[in-house]
From Swiss-Prot:
Family: Belongs to the ZipA family.
Annotated source species: Cronobacter sakazakii (strain ATCC BAA-894)
Periplasmic side: 1-6
Topology of this chain in the membrane: Single-pass type I membrane protein
Lineage: Bacteria, Pseudomonadati, Pseudomonadota, Gammaproteobacteria, Enterobacterales
Biased composition (Pro residues): 152-168
GO biological process, one term: FtsZ-dependent cytokinesis
Regions that span the bilayer: 7-27
Signal peptide annotation: none
Record-given protein name: Cell division protein ZipA
Region (Disordered) residue spans: 37-177
Stretches with biased composition (Low complexity): 73-86
Length: 319
C-alpha cells in the first residue's frame, strides 16, 4: 500500500514540475513578444509628437513668444479595438532609417507582398487617425470566353415500322406410303450327287410343265399355258449366268435348275406357290432329280409351311 502511494506521489510531483516548466517558458515568451510589439508603437508615438510640435510653433510675437496651443487628445474607449496604423513601418529587427520631418503624411503605396500588421495592445490608448478611403479601382472585366457552339440537335428519325414477315405455310407433305414388302420364294431341282441333268430331257420336261422361253433368255410360266397373260414364276439355269440356249439343248448338261416366284405377284400368291411346287416335282420326276429348298437342302414339309407363312406375311403387310 505504501509503495503504491509513493508511486502516485512521484507521478503527481513529476507532472507538477513539468507544468511549472511549461508555464514559465510560456510566460517568458509572452513577455518577450510584448516587448517587441511595444517598440514600434513607442517609435511611432515619438515621431507623431515631433510632428505636432512643429505644427504648433507659429510666427513669434513682438516679445518673441509665440502662442501656445494646447491640444487634448480624446481618449479612445477601452472597449473599442485599436485601429491599425495606415502608414508603413519597419519591423523592430530592421535598421532604423534617419527620420525627416514632413508636413503631411504621405499615403503609403500598397504593398505587393502580404505582411501581417502588428496588433496593438488593448490597454494602451491611441489617438484615432483619419482613415483615408482609397477610390476603388475599376475592375477590368475578364475577357469573355468564346462560347462553345454546340452542334444543332439532329432530328431523330425513327425507322419506319417494318412489316412483320409472314411465315410462308410449310407444305405438309403427305405421309410417305410404306414401301411394299417383298420376298422371293426359291426352290431348286438338282441331279443326284456326281451326275448331271441331260439337256434334251430337261428341255422336254420344262415345256410339258407349261414354261415358255422368253425375256433374259430364261423360261417363264404365264397365267395361260399358251404363254399369254402375266408371269407367275420363272425358271433359270443353276449355273451362271443362268441363261439357256434352246438351239443347243441336245448337247447341254447342268447340275440343276432354279425356279423362283416374286411376292407379291399376280393373282393369289398361295395358289401360284402350289402350281410352282407341282411344276418342280414334275421336272424332278422326268429328269431323275430331287427338289431342294433355297439353301439347296432337301425340301421338307416344315420348309413348305415356312414358305407359305412368308407369303401370308407379305400379303398382310401390303393389305
Amino acid at each position: 500500500m505504501m509503495q503504491d502511494l509513493r508511486l502516485i506521489l512521484i507521478i503527481v510531483g513529476a507532472i507538477a514540475i513539468i507544468a511549472l516548466l511549461v508555464h514559465g517558458l510560456w510566460t517568458s515568451r509572452k513577455e518577450r513578444s510584448s516587448m517587441f510589439r511595444d517598440r514600434p508603437m513607442k517609435r511611432m508615438k515619438s515621431k507623431r509628437d515631433e510632428d505636432e510640435d512643429e505644427d504648433d510653433v507659429d510666427e513669434p510675437d513682438d516679445d518673441g513668444v509665440g502662442e501656445v496651443r494646447v491640444r487634448r487628445s480624446a481618449p479612445a474607449p477601452e472597449s473599442a479595438p485599436a485601429r491599425q496604423p495606415q502608414h508603413n513601418y519597419q519591423p523592430p529587427y530592421a535598421p532604423s532609417q534617419p527620420r525627416q520631418p514632413v508636413r503631411e503624411p504621405v499615403e503609403p503605396e500598397p504593398e505587393v507582398a502580404y505582411r501581417e500588421a502588428p496588433q496593438a495592445p488593448l490597454h494602451q490608448p491611441q489617438e484615432p487617425q483619419p482613415v483615408r478611403q482609397t477610390a476603388p479601382q475599376p475592375s477590368q472585366p475578364a475577357p469573355a470566353q468564346p462560347a462553345m457552339r454546340q452542334p444543332a440537335p439532329q432530328p431523330v428519325t425513327e425507322p419506319a415500322p417494318q412489316p412483320e414477315p409472314v411465315a410462308e405455310p410449310v407444305p405438309v407433305s403427305a405421309p410417305e406410303k410404306p414401301q411394299p414388302k417383298e420376298t422371293v420364294i426359291i426352290m431348286n431341282v438338282a441331279a443326284h450327287a456326281g451326275s448331271q441333268l441331260n439337256g434334251d430331257v430337261l428341255f422336254n420336261s420344262i415345256q410339258q410343265a407349261g414354261f415358255k422361253f422368253g425375256d433374259m433368255n430364261i423360261f417363264h410360266r404365264h397365267l395361260s399355258p399358251d404363254g399369254s397373260g402375266p408371269v407367275l414364276f420363272s425358271l433359270a439355269n443353276m449355273v451362271k449366268p443362268g441363261s439357256f440356249d434352246p438351239e443347243s439343248m441336245t448337247d447341254f448338261t447342268t447340275p440343276g435348275i432354279t425356279i423362283f416366284m416374286q411376292v407379291p405377284g399376280f393373282g393369289d400368291e398361295l395358289q401360284n406357290f402350289k402350281l410352282m411346287l407341282q411344276s418342280a416335282q414334275h421336272i424332278a420326276d422326268e429328269v431323275g432329280g430331287v427338289v431342294l429348298d433355297d439353301q439347296r437342302r432337301m425340301m421338307t414339309p416344315q420348309k413348305l409351311r415356312e414358305y407359305q407363312d412368308r407369303i401370308r406375311d407379305v400379303k398382310e403387310a401390303n393389305g
